[in-house]
Amino acid sequence: MLKVAALYQFTPLPDFRALREPLRELCAAHAIKGSILLAAEGINGTVAGTPRAIDALVSELQTGALFSGRLNDLELKFSQASAMPFARLKVRLKKEIVTLGDPATDPTRAVGIYVDPQDWNELIATPDTILLDVRNDFEVVMGSFEGAIDPQLARFGQFKDFAAQELDHRKHRRIAMYCTGGIRCEKASSYLLSRGFKEVYHLKGGILKYLEQIPESESRWRGECFVFDDRIALGHGLKESRQASPVMDGAPHDD
């Protein structure tokens, strides 16, 4: 059984271009495959390998000399795969690690209020809470939380247009949002706060952490959670979907 790690952190990496090759070499040395994005604003990736290989990579990212302690708050989610879910290893340089297209939005300055999975059901059941799914439309089709609004985004960058047209900080006082692993909510919640919204919450660890920690008997989630690798989707307990698909490139949620 292989170990899959979804990881990200918003943190200044002015030397991100110089980090690309040593990071690629580190992953290759451990036969790790998947995709990692580097940008001046941080790191975002999903990778797979043996448990020992993934543990070695995570240890280096968090405490090794390569990032010099800048990833000590790395957001991590682990799951399993019965076979290698990625075709190759890619370490890419990007303008953003998740593409919103608004340079003024900075999650290192302000983000919404994190809500642990154990407290999520109570929040979304609260009257007047607007529940937003900030994933792409093809992901929402496979599963969502009961009562969630689907903004019908073809790509994450369209969230700005949705917010401008459909959300009003004077009318929508409390907003709760979620995504696969949490990274898109970091950007989306930061964006809404900069537009005058006061109460913005997001699911800590995303859908994946919720499915890992919340028993199916207590869950408000319906369907499966799409993931960007050959497993296609995960269910409660992070069990692999039975749906078949060709091996994907393993692109993390950058758009």
From Swiss-Prot:
Record keywords: Oxidoreductase, tRNA processing
EC number: 1.14.-.-
Function according to Swiss-Prot or TrEMBL: Catalyzes oxygen-dependent 5-hydroxyuridine (ho5U) modification at position 34 in tRNAs.
Homology family: Belongs to the TrhO family.
InterPro entries: Rhodanese-like_dom (IPR001763), Rhodanese-like_dom_sf (IPR036873), TrhO (IPR020936), TRHO_N (IPR040503)
Gene3D superfamilies recorded: 3.30.70.100, Rhodanese-like domain
Protein name from the UniProt record: tRNA uridine(34) hydroxylase
Name of the encoding gene: trhO
GO molecular function list: oxidoreductase activity, acting on paired donors, with incorporation or reduction of molecular oxygen
Pfam family, one: UPF0176_N
One GO-annotated biological process of the protein: tRNA modification
Domain named Rhodanese: residues: 125-219
Superkingdom of the organism of origin: Bacteria
PROSITE patterns attached to this UniProt entry: RHODANESE_3
Catalytic reactions of this protein: uridine(34) in tRNA + AH2 + O2 = 5-hydroxyuridine(34) in tRNA + A + H2O
Catalytic residues (positions): 179
